[in-house]
Every structure is written in structure tokens, then in C-alpha cells.
Regions:
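N-terminal signal peptide c-region/cleavage motif recognized by signal peptidases
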Residues: 7-9
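Extracellular/lumen-exposed scaffold segments
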Residues: 11-197
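Sec-dependent signal peptide recognition
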Residues: 1-5
Length: 197
């Protein structure tokens, strides 16, 4: 039997900070707001204690990416902030330390109560896979900081254009070669390989 600690227990387009009794190292919060164009913006905030991490959509050799099982099927565009690389005991993973926010866009008919279960993997010396059931009352506002926080989260996403002056890739005899040039030079460059969706 799992015992859940809900902070706070309120119905709003803001879940408040949720913690699970079996994982005191992470807190999660979901907020959502439907826009005039019909799209719904959702922000998943994750706060991790020092020394703990969670994972990117392509977590690397270990770890599990966060996922949401929606109670109502939805079309979701989940956006991922630029990750960090973690090398521990010869295993390389990609993800996040500290606080991270994942901005998402939901399309389609949003029910008055948006609910589901977030599954989040967090790791330090041990790994914990935790489920966070949530329910958002979409008839109420997400709060006055939502637009600011969503815009700020969008600013943490990888740049699509303008970072390189030249980018080429070739695959010959089982070897992938990626060449990236930047006129301004590089400071601590990193390449993150993402699996195909």
C-alpha cells in the first residue's frame, strides 16, 4: 500500500507541490492554462534535492525519461531543456540536477479535469522510480506567474538555428562523423545523441 502526501489538496489548474512518501528527494508541480487559440500550455516543474538527478528524453546508458500516462488521450508536444551529461562508474547518462521545468503544449479537446500519472526516475547513489498522480481543474486559472514561468522554461530549450556556421554529418563504414563549426569558437562543446521518435 502506497501512502501519498499531497501538498496542498486543492483543485486548480495548479497541482501545488507533490511529494511521495517513498521519495522525499523530489517534488513535482504541474500547472496548465488554455489559450485563446485552443492550445493548452502545461508546465511540469521538478525540484530535486542536492545530489539527485532526473533524466532527459534520451537518458543514455542508464535512467528512465519522465513520462505522463494521461487519463484522457491527448496530443502532447513535450519540450526538453538542454541536458547535462553525467559520467558515473563508466556509465554515461543525460539529464538534470537541481530544479528543471518542462514546458508542454497539449492539443485537442481538454477535459474540465486534466489528470494522469507522472512517472519520474530520480537517482543519487540509488535510483527511485516514483508515480505522482495529479488532477488539474481547468476551469480555474493557473496563477499570475504562469506566463512568466512558461516563457522562462522555453528559454532553457536548445537553440534550433544560429549556433553553428557549418554543420555536416556523414556515415561511412559503420562510423558516424559529425562536424560542427562556429565562427565565434566553442566553449565546452557537447554533443547529445537523441533517439528517433
Amino acid at each position: 500500500c502506497l501512502l501519498w502526501l499531497w501538498l496542498p489538496v486543492s483543485q486548480a489548474a495548479d497541482s501545488g507541490w507533490l511529494r511521495a512518501a517513498d521519495n522525499q528527494h523530489a517534488s513535482v508541480r504541474l500547472r496548465a492554462q488554455t489559450e485563446s487559440n485552443g492550445d493548452t500550455r502545461l508546465l511540469l516543474d521538478v525540484a530535486l534535492e542536492k545530489g539527485w538527478k532526473t533524466y532527459w528524453r534520451s537518458p543514455g546508458e542508464g535512467g528512465i525519461a519522465p513520462a505522463i500516462a494521461w487519463h484522457t488521450p491527448l496530443e502532447v508536444n513535450w519540450r526538453w531543456p538542454t541536458p547535462q551529461r553525467f559520467d558515473v562508474a563508466g556509465i554515461s547518462t543525460q539529464g538534470y540536477h537541481g530544479d528543471v521545468s518542462f514546458p508542454m503544449t497539449l492539443r485537442g479537446k481538454i477535459p474540465p479535469t486534466l489528470s494522469g500519472v507522472l512517472t519520474l526516475s530520480t537517482c543519487s547513489n540509488v535510483c527511485i522510480l516514483t508515480d505522482y498522480p495529479f488532477s488539474l481543474d481547468m476551469t480555474t486559472p493557473a496563477g499570475e506567474r504562469f506566463n512568466y514561468d512558461f516563457t522562462r522554461a522555453m528559454g532553457t530549450l536548445p537553440l534550433r538555428d544560429g549556433l553553428t556556421s557549418q554543420l555536416t554529418a556523414s556515415y561511412v563504414s559503420g562510423k558516424l562523423t559529425v562536424t560542427a563549426r562556429r565562427d565565434a569558437g566553442w566553449q565546452q562543446p557537447a554533443l547529445f545523441i537523441d533517439s528517433m521518435e
